[in-house]
């Protein structure tokens, strides 16, 4: 204690310096490896440090690739009428190989379009449709009757013969209607109307 009261020499100062142990570079590398949660070879040298930096930069590049890929998809769909609403979903996407499979990805959610049936729709009621179908034969018969009367008045024998054959075939069809109703009961237009009694048509003269 007596030596402390006198002048302090440089040698005494060195005695009071706290002992600081120099850290080995290999120990520093081990500490950094434990902090990152990854195990790397602890070979001392500049190559190992470069590989460690390259691994961290590769992870950052993967994140950038994922973001750029999603942004490019949004830019492509913009202006085409597609909804570009971003919905964050926690699920992996297989759109890019370089993207990480853990994290939040943005997926485009398109509006659900209502499915339209391709079946033809009836724009007319059944009653109006039946009325139109029944008016067509009446118009045809009236025109045919007028043409037949003109041909008979002119005296063309061949025309009169062809018209007579057509009329006979029509009469035969009218006579067969009751039998056709029993054989084909799925025709709604014929079933809705009662079968009227067929009047005997006078034979046309072949003069």
Swiss-Prot record:
Q: Reply yes or no: does the keyword Mitochondrion apply.
A: no
Coarsely, its chief localization is virion
Listed CDD domains: embe-CoV_Protein-I_like
Does the UniProt entry include the keyword Nucleotidyltransferase?
no
Enumerate the UniProt keywords alphabetically: Virion
Write out the GO cellular component annotations: virion component
List where in the cell it is found. Virion
Q: Which family does the record assign?
A: Belongs to the coronavirus I protein family.
Miscellaneous: The gene encoding this protein is included within the N gene (alternative ORF).
Protein name per UniProt: Protein I
Q: Which organism is it from?
A: Bovine coronavirus (strain 98TXSF-110-LUN)
Query: From which lineage does this chain's organism come?
Result: Viruses, Riboviria, Orthornavirae, Pisuviricota, Pisoniviricetes
């Amino acid at each position: 204690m007596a030596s402390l009261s006198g002048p302090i020499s440089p040698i005494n100062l060195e005695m009071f310096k706290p002992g600081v142990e120099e850290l080995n570079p290999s120990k520093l590398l081990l500490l950094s490896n434990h902090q990152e949660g990854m195990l790397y070879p602890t070979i001392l040298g500049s190559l190992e440090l470069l590989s460690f930096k390259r691994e961290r930069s590769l992870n950052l590049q993967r994140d950038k690739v994922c973001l750029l890929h999603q942004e490019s998809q949004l830019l492509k769909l913009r202006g085409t009428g597609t909804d570009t609403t971003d919905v964050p979903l926690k699920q992996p996407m297989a759109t890019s190989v370089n993207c990480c499979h853990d994290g939040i990805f943005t997926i485009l959610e398109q509006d659900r379009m209502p499915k339209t049936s391709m079946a033809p729709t009836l724009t007319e009621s059944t009653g109006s449709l039946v009325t139109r179908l029944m008016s067509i034969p009446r118009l045809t018969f009236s025109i045919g009757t007028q043409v037949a009367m003109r041909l008979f008045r002119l005296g063309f024998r061949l025309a009169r013969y062809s018209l007579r054959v057509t009329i006979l075939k029509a009469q035969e069809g009218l006579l067969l209607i009751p039998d056709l109703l029993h054989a084909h009961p799925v025709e709604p237009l014929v079933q809705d109307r009662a079968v009227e009694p067929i009047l005997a048509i006078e034979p046309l003269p072949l003069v």
